[in-house]
Swiss-Prot record:
Name of the protein in question: ESX-4 secretion system protein EccC4
Keyword Cell division assigned: no
InterPro entries with a match to the protein in the record: AAA+_ATPase, EccCa-like_Actinobacteria, EccCb-like_Actinobacteria, FtsK/SpoIIIE/SftA, FtsK_dom, P-loop_NTPase
Recorded superkingdom: Bacteria
Length: 1236
């Protein structure tokens, strides 16, 4: 076994707490001192009482000797006690200080134990990094940790046992220090979050009870540990699974431990996955094995121990419960069990599948001498880990690049001169065809073969986008391969940020490690045991750097920064180019300590590089070059060739084989293959030295830190983004894209938080930049993370129809297009009504903010309101085609956030959004703009947003981002969400019959006076004349005012007897003739003269009903001081009645405030033209002041708000807005009652 970090195990002896001190006898001097003082006090008192003393004249002097006597007594009594208490206090301080020092030692021991335990039993999720390394299969049968497997993390005893010395007797013990010792032992006797391991070789079956998903996750972690730590020659892993559960264990087939040592099928060694325990016993009966671990996931459990087999059963099913391990009669509950996902177990198994004990594969012969130069020899037998361990400090960062004419190896050493190297930074120049690309590949491959990824990482840059480094991308050493920068100018700035970010990251690591001065000191600290993250040398190779600087001259500042601080930060630079123009380096040449020059086009180019023309005189042989060190020495060399084919060893014999066939690879045994005649032999492609070595490097060492993450070329899928996202910190925070942060070397979700002041959204971008997709992504993200009871959407689609694709979501109440103006208007009206209703609700319930309401909603389902989003795709089109809605939307954006109503819109330019609305938008998503100068985020960065990349844009902080594609299935969301759904926008029918409204009302509502159907729920709506005694109907001509009066008259007759209701109909245009043919008719007036007479008698009746002074309160409450029917005065065409010459109805003005008590009801219909002015007429003004109901039918909006907050608007005949008070408005369709 590889030795891990050491951990102390010797017991720590803890000193016991001190005993309480005994009282010590005072010395003779101290005992005599009170006597002496007493004598002195008596002498003073005698002196005081002598004749002629001041005491004889002033008795107050007697107090002084008395005070001396009292002070003496007190001092004598308490002095000894203070000394005793002071001694105990000092003992306590000393002991507590001792515990403090001991605590530091114990804490260090616990930290070292943590490191040791995590090294011995690492997290199963990291096991794949150990495959192929020196620790793989390290545990041998004789070792103490053989078959000892981690199962989770928890509390473990401290490695150094705390042993307390002999405690003093309880009666003599100091309670303070004893309590401190007890707390110290309780706190440090165990360590938390330590790996918990159990032995599997216990002589009996092991069962794990609990939730099946968690149990299988724990078993996957245990199996992968067994496979990584133990050789397949010493431990085999079998599976006994039912057909129902076989899919959970299909990944076992990849483990070399699961291959039968003797039995074979058509695909090779038979996988040891069986259906029953008996089948497994029969299959292994003839096999002599040291250890077999069998996973049992069937209904066949508890059959006892099987000789030579360790069985681990999926035990009793307990849904939702954590796993519990039952082993040898002991039950171990796991509070934090290990879990390994199926895909992670599959990755681990497939990595192990490439390894066999003693397996060497095909034999390869060296290619062009490179393998011998590096010290590899046979590439097939090349073990990178072994070579890396054998590389000494001198050979670190030192690699052969070729040979001199006499065959001596030429070494390139990029260590500092202080370490006998050539320096960290260098230059490579060579003309086309000179072998420059091959030299760069040789250097990169040699560096990777000689140095572990923990020592060296590479960042490979090819400005022109050639194939120089493409094959190296898969090596563990390679932090990134960056190509094709010439065609993607924004990527150059991105690389500049990435390199600057890497310098910043390394500086921060050095500061955190104790303000170390260099990476060398950092690595030295790690070697001495400091727990620091790996910080390898970063070797940056830039090909065609001259072209890079010619197009982006500002990039030289990055090279200069690396040249200045790269030595201490461990960032080494190699610049390569076909030619070196004079003055191109601009001060960088002082940092280049070594130079390699291949064949050049001219002598001047050679002199620019080497100071001589020797490179121009080199032969035309590719790979011929010169190496110049910092001392000026020139070394001629011929580059090693790594791109040539790798010669194979000649086979000793050729055996005919059956033609290959495709077979499924499963855990079931495969049927044998019938060999057919051997046809022609297919030629096997010969790998190159480069590819063969790269194949051997894969899986060895940790992956390099990613300095360069892939650009945002392809938008992510929303489903994957939501799966990988961390839990939201706010109610309405959802990820909708990815933000690229090259300086931080990370990609972070573009999270939009709509729960606060940023609840309104604007997506702005040029045509075809993905605005509609961004809105759909926002809708789908919220719908996927919230049910329809929490978020709801109402969409106005004036773009290309993209929002119609979300109509199937349960969260979407309606989608209105250009051809649906009524639905669009109703949608705005409903949202405005929702805001008013919620405002009243918040006020009535003392809710001060929507955030507070969301907290209350989470605790109680009562009165649950969803956050409502008005989504508008195509703001400019809406302003042009539905200008009347703009003001309502602006008001909604300004007021709605306080009550959970949001606005999200898209526009082509920021200028399309007026400042009054733009100021209300807190979340701004800026895609590519037609003119980057219009950007409100970052005009310079807006120029770098690529064209023809829909979804690309800038985040709020000016970083590049891409919007995710909404790949979620709306039907699936509907199935998953189920209940509830967003209420649809109710649309009234063009006509509703009177009889159907009465039939629909039922018995309870049918007893009231019905008006028609209301839009919200499509239910009949009643007019309560008991609560609101008057009704005013306003509307244009032919809008249905008279039909509304006709319906009301018939409803009064239907719901009241003649003794309870009488109607006085004022109808100057004779439109209500014969509407009532019963005893309910109290009078029909068709002229002003007749009206005066009728009203005169009505006034007398009302005056008689006025309460007399002797009417009691009970009579007033019951309205019983008069009897008779209620009088309904129905006036059609009020504008014909109230003329300039006078208004006969003025006689009723004084009775209107008392109408409810007097049984008077005034129902007035008037045209809406001039209604804003007419409402100041005394009768109508009184009605409005009294809060009467109003039915606003079709009218002109320029009249303004007549009743409530609603303006008149064009409406179909028979339709109107019934206003009953502030915030209580509903659209109704008046029941159609045909004329007689």
């Amino acid at each position: 076994m590889n030795s891990g970090p050491a951990c102390a195990t010797a017991d720590i002896l803890v000193a016991p707490p001190p005993e309480l001190r005994r009282s010590e006898p005072s010395s003779l001097l101290i005992r005599l001192l009170p006597v002496v003082m007493s004598v002195a006090t008596v002498g003073v008192m005698v002196t005081v009482f002598l004749p002629g003393s001041p005491a004889t004249r002033h008795p107050t002097f007697l107090a002084f000797p008395m005070m001396m006597l009292v002070s003496l007594v007190v001092t004598a009594v308490t002095g000894r006690g203070r000394r005793h208490v002071s001694g105990i206090h000092n003992d306590r301080v000393d002991y507590l200080g001792y515990l403090s020092v001991l605590r530091t030692s114990v804490t260090q021991t616990a930290a070292a134990q943590h490191v040791s335990l995590n090294w011995t039993h690492p997290d199963p999720a990291t096991l794949w990094t150990l495959i192929g390394g020196p620790r793989m299969w390290e545990r041998r049968p004789g070792a103490a940790d053989f078959c000892r497997i981690r199962v989770g993390v928890g509390s473990a005893p401290l490695a150094t046992r705390l042993v307390v010395g002999q405690l003093p007797p309880a009666q003599r013990a100091d309670p303070v220090t004893r309590a401190a010792l007890r707390c110290f032992l309780a706190a440090h006797a165990t360590i938390a979050d330590a790996p918990i391991a159990i032995p599997l070789r216990v002589g009996g079956p092991i069962a794990i009870d609990g939730d099946p998903t968690k149990v299988r996750g724990l078993l996957r972690a245990m199996i992968c540990q067994l496979a990584v730590w133990h050789s397949p020659e010493e431990l085999l892993i079998a599976g006994v699974v039912s057909d129902r559960n076989r899919a959970h264990w299909d990944w076992l087939k990849w483990l070399p431990h699961n291959q039968h040592p003797n039995a074979c099928d058509a695909l090779g060694p038979a996988p040891m996955v069986y259906s029953t325990l008996a089948e497994m016993q029969n299959a292994l009966a003839a096999t002599v094995l040291a250890h077999v671990v069998a996973i049992v996931d069937t209904a066949e459990r508890g059959n006892g121990a099987i000789t030579g087999v360790i069985t681990i059963e999926v035990g009793a099913r307990r849904d939702g419960a954590p796993p519990v391990v039952r082993c040898a009669g002991e039950v171990t509950a796991l509070a934090c069990p290990d879990q390994l996902e199926p895909q992670d177990a599959l990755v681990c198994a497939r990595r192990l599948a490439a390894h066999r004990v003693g397996h060497s594969g095909r034999t390869f012969i060296r290619g062009s001498g490179w393998a011998e130069l590096v010290g590899i020899g046979d590439v097939a037998a090349f073990d990178p880990s072994t070579l890396w361990r054998n590389v000494n400090q001198h050979d670190r960062l030192r690699v052969p690049i070729g040979v001199t004419p006499d065959g001596t190896a030429v070494q390139l050493d990029i260590k500092e001169a202080a370490e006998q190297g050539m320096g960290p930074h260098g230059l490579c120049v060579g003309a086309t065809g000179s072998g420059k690309s091959e030299l760069l590949r040789t250097i990169a491959l040699g560096m990777m073969a000689r140095n572990s990824p923990e020592v060296l990482n590479l960042l490979l840059v090819d400005f022109k986008g050639g194939a120089t480094f493409l094959d190296l991308a898969g090596a563990p050493h390679v932090a990134a391969v960056i190509t094709n920068l010439a065609e993607e100018a924004p990527l150059v700035a991105r690389m500049q940020d990435a390199l600057a970010g890497e310098m910043s990251r390394r500086q921060q690591l050095l500061r955190m490690a104790g303000h170390l001065v260099s990476v060398t000191a950092y690595q030295r600290a790690r070697q001495t045991g400091a727990q620091l993250p790996c910080l390898p040398i970063l070797f940056i190779v830039v090909d065609e750097f001259s072209e890079l600087l010619s197009q982006h001259p500002e990039f030289v500042d990055v090279f200069l920064a690396i040249g200045r601080v790269g030595r201490s930060l461990g960032m080494h630079l190699l610049l390569a180019s076909q030619r070196l123009d004079e003055g191109r380096l601009r001060g960088l040449e002082t940092h280049l300590s070594y130079r390699m020059c291949l064949k050049t086009w001219s002598a001047s180019e050679s002199r620019n590089v080497l100071g001589t023309q020797d490179a121009y005189q080199l032969p035309n042989t590719p790979g011929a070059g010169l190496l110049q060190t910092e001392t000026g020495e020139l070394i001629r060399f011929q580059t090693a060739f790594v791109s040539g084919p790798l010669r194979r060893a000649s086979p000793s014999a050729v055996h005919p084989v059956a033609p290959p066939s495709v077979r499924p690879f499963t855990t079931h045994a495969a049927a044998p293959v019938t060999a057919g005649p051997v046809g022609g032999t297919a030629e096997v492609p010969t790998p190159t030295v480069l590819h063969a070595v790269l194949d051997r490097l894969v899986g060895h060492g940790p992956a390099a830190h990613q300095v360069w993450l892939p650009p945002l070329d392809e938008p992510p899928m929303l489903g994957a983004l939501l799966r990988d996202a961390e839990p939201a910190q706010a109610e309405l925070a959802v990820p909708i894209g990815i933000v690229d942060r090259p300086f931080e070397q990370s990609r972070v979700p573009l999270t939009i938080d709509l729960s606060g002041a940023a609840g309104n959204v604007a997506v702005v971008g040029a045509p075809q930049t993905g605005k509609s997709t961004a809105l759909r992504t926002l809708i789908m993200a919220l719908a996927a993370t919230h049910d329809a009871g929490r978020v709801q959407f109402y969409c106005l689609d004036f773009g290309g129809g993209a929002l119609a694709q979300v109509d199937e979501l349960p969260h979407v109440g309606a989608v209105a297009g250009r051809a649906q103006p009524q639905l669009a208007s109703r949608m705005l009206a409903e949202l405005e009504s929702a805001v008013r209703f919620r405002e009243a609700f918040f006020r009535d319930h003392g809710i001060d903010s929507v955030a507070r309401y969301r907290q209350l909603r989470a605790k109680s389902a009562a009165e649950s309101f969803a956050d409502i989003f008005l989504v508008i795709d195509g703001w400019a089109s809406l302003r042009q085609e539905f200008a009347a809605l703009e003001e309502s939307i602006v008001a909604l954006a300004a007021q709605g956030l306080s009550f959970g109503v949001h606005v999200a819109l898209s526009a082509a330019r920021w200028a399309e959004i007026r400042p009054s609305l733009r100021d209300q938008i807190g979340s701004r998503i800026e895609l590519r703009l037609a003119d980057p100068a219009d950007s409100e985020l970052d005009r310079r960065q807006a120029q770098r947003v690529p064209v023809d990349r829909p979804g690309r844009g800038l985040s709020r902080d000016g970083m590049h981002m891409v919007i995710a594609l909404p790949d979620l299935d709306g039907v699936a969301l509907r199935r998953r969400s189920g209940d509830p759904v967003a209420p649809p926008i109710p649309l009234l029918p063009a006509r509703v019959d009177y009889d159907s409204v009465v039939a629909r009302a039922g018995d309870e509502l049918g007893a009231h006076i019905l008006l028609g159907l209301e839009e919200r729920r499509g239910q009949p709506v009643a007019v309560d004349f008991g609560r609101h005694p008057h009704l005013l109907v306003l509307g244009d001509n032919e809008c249905g005012k008279t039909a509304a009066l006709r319906t009301l008259c018939r409803e009064i007759v239907r719901t009241h007897t003649a003794a309870r209701a009488q109607l006085l109909i004022v109808d100057f245009r004779h439109t209500l003739l014969d509407v009532i043919e019963s005893e309910h008719m109290g009078g029909y007036v068709s002229s002003p003269a007749a009206l005066g007479a009728k009203l005169s008698s009505l006034v007398d009746l009302l005056q008689a009903r006025m309460p007399a002074p002797d009417v009691s309160q009970a009579q007033l409450r019951a309205r019983s001081w008069w009897s008779g029917p209620d009088i309904y005065v129905v006036v059609d065409d009020y504008d014909l009645v109230a003329v300039s010459s006078g208004n006969p109805l003025m006689v009723l003005l004084e009775y209107l405030p008392h109408a409810r008590d007097l049984g008077l009801h005034l129902v007035v219909a008037r045209r809406s033209g001039g209604a804003a002015r007419a409402l100041f007429e005394p009768v109508l003004a009184s009605l409005r002041d009294l809060g009467c109901r109003a039915l606003l039918m079709s009218g002109r909006p320029d009249e303004g708000a007549l009743f409530g907050s609603s303006r008149p608007m064009p409406l179909p005949p028979g339709r109107g807005i019934l206003v009953t008070g502030a915030g209580d408005e509903q659209l109704v369709q008046v029941a159609w009652s045909p004329p007689p």
